[in-house]
Regions:
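C-terminal lobe and adjacent flexible extensions of AdoMet/dcAdoMet transferase-like proteins
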Residues: 212-256
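Residues lining the SAM
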Residues: 110-112
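Class I SAM-dependent methyltransferase "Motif I" SAM/SAH-binding loop
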Residues: 47-49
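SAM-dependent methyltransferase
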Residues: 142-219
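A short glycine-rich, Lys/Arg-flanked "PGG" loop and its adjoining helix->strand segment in the class I
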Residues: 124-136
Length: 256
């Protein structure tokens, strides 16, 4: 009798950890690590997740702490930090209102995390709290993603064909599919996602979620940063993933 396979739902933290280890995000991590080598320590990674970038920096001897709002992801990150005997402090905070016991020379926010804050007033408050964590002369780096491919080829609630990623170490195959709805006037994208994990040709894990994101135009974000008090705001296109899709890297300095 064939063994029955139980399909379990992946937690968000397990999903992110698996995806980072198996997908082509190495290019993204490499980019950030390369940029951060030019910056001063100590550093803080906001939205550190399970710690892919943080661990790379620690391995190079960079003094870097991590912060996230997801306790489960902080736990996975902390377990790895402890196992590798790295010296990083991790903070689990409420993104709506946070402060930390120290200041930093460099703060970076990867994964276009700011796009997940769909209210401009809340995004401004978040960035103000970040500003207050920087030393005078400190630098903020973060990236913003605008979904140009979805905007130019928009089909409401049409599911994309699944993108498959294979983990060469385990042979597991990860399939990601999504459909989206766009509010162009408010710059809001609502995404319904399905993540499937296959092993030996059989579905073994699945995760569904729905999320909203807001894209910020370059000059719009520049004005937000300058109104908070940042100076020397600059931005450049980075990490092109297709003819249309790319992220924009922002850098800004706190000068009092």
């Amino acid at each position: 009798m064939a063994k029955e396979i139980t399909i379990k739902e992946l937690t968000e933290a397990e999903l992110i950890d698996w995806f980072y280890k198996a997908s082509g995000t190495k290019q993204y991590v490499d980019f950030y690590v390369s940029e951060l080598r030019k910056q001063q320590q100590p550093m803080l990674e906001i939205n550190c997740g399970t710690g892919e970038i943080l661990r790379r920096l620690n391995a190079e001897g960079v003094s870097c702490d991590g912060m996230d709002c997801a306790a489960e992801q902080i736990k996975i990150c902390g377990d790895e930090i402890s196992r590798l005997e790295y010296d990083s402090t991790l903070y689990c905070v409420d993104y709506n209102n946070f402060t930390l016991p120290k200041l930093y020379k460099t703060i970076f926010i990867p994964q276009s995390m700011l796009c997940m804050i769909t209210d401009v007033e809340m995004a401004t408050k978040f960035l103000t709290n970040v500003y207050n964590l920087l030393e005078n002369g400190g630098t903020l780096l973060f990236d913003i993603y605008i979904p140009w491919k979805d905007i130019t080829d928009y089909h409401s609630n049409k599911w994309s064909s699944g993108d498959a990623i294979e983990n060469p170490e385990t042979g597991e195959i990860f399939v990601y599919s999504y459909c989206c709805d766009l509010d162009l006037s408010q710059q809001i994208k609502t995404t319904n996602s399905k993540y499937e994990l296959y092993k030996d040709g059989k579905l073994v894990s699945v995760h569904f979620d729905s999320s909203q994101s807001r894209w910020y135009n370059d000059n719009e974000m520049k004005i937000i940063l300058e109104n908070i008090g940042f100076s020397s705001v600059s931005f450049s296109k980075i990490l092109k993933t297709s003819d249309l899709d790319y992220s924009t890297l922002f850098t800004a300095t706190k000068l009092i």
